[in-house]
Amino acid sequence: MICCVEVRLTIPDNEARTALSTLRRLGVSVERLERADLYRFDVEKDAEKDLVATLRGFETVYNPNKHALRVREEERPGAGEVWVDEIDGAEVRSGGAVRIGGRALPGVRSMERFTAWKLMCATGAAVPERVVLEATETLLCNPAFQKATRK
């Protein structure tokens, strides 16, 4: 079973602000930009609930003072989104337990980590796919060592 978990800052995100400012200066038509860490897990049946509780206890992944954590319904990027990960080593598969920060994730067969970018217009609606592509190629993904997954 695939389980996607999003961890988003609840405090101001300076990286997203800087990226938004840069995209605007480069002429990309985007009004709002949000960033989140996204983990896509292949978990054993009935392990999702325990996984979320485990992640909430990992301070290297989730700090309740500055993060919001949610399980996403979708296994792929939605409208206005791009997920960026490194070409080499983004997916962790293990004969033993998959680990984050040295700590085991029981019931997890594999894990992928992405940076999820959501691009929006002034109303909060997703920007058109052509704008996502332009932002991805212009700034959000460096094809020398990263790959982008779009809708």
Residue ranges of model-derived segments:
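Core nucleic-acid recognition elements
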Residues: M1-K151
